[in-house]
């Protein structure tokens, strides 16, 4: 059977000809405006959602802390993900919205740059850390919260073009 992912595949840009990890050389790429949007969910009991919305939590402002953690995380992505390029970020916005139907919170991050490579990992890191921080801030109320559906919602700009996956 033929290997569907040969080590020298052009699709595996983070591997060299010997299959060793490498940081992709983007020095010949043109700087363009690039944006990525990612989302995550934190599912919780209705009582936990109500307590967070009312501000009745032992650690303080859950949502403000989670939002700031997400922004800070986007800026640290290259320090967390080994082969990510450090990028100048022009915009990082983290929105945390209550969703009584879940019940819990929807988290959405939008990250924008003018650079040689995209910001998908920065957006995904932002929602992941915002969700983890929300969990940390509210775990005294409920330890059974679930972080779910971390996904890339869209990516625009760059050589590979725009990406809009189908809704889950």
Curated annotation (Swiss-Prot):
Keywords: Lyase, Molybdenum cofactor biosynthesis. Substrate binds at residues 83-85, 121-122. Its EC number is 4.6.1.17. GO terms for molecular function: cyclic pyranopterin monophosphate synthase activity. Pfam families: MoaC. PANTHER family: CYCLIC PYRANOPTERIN MONOPHOSPHATE SYNTHASE, MOLYBDOPTERIN COFACTOR SYNTHESIS PROTEIN A. Catalyzes the conversion of (8S)-3',8-cyclo-7,8-dihydroguanosine 5'-triphosphate to cyclic pyranopterin monophosphate (cPMP). Homohexamer; trimer of dimers. This is Cyclic pyranopterin monophosphate synthase. It comes from Trichormus variabilis (strain ATCC 29413 / PCC 7937) (Anabaena variabilis).
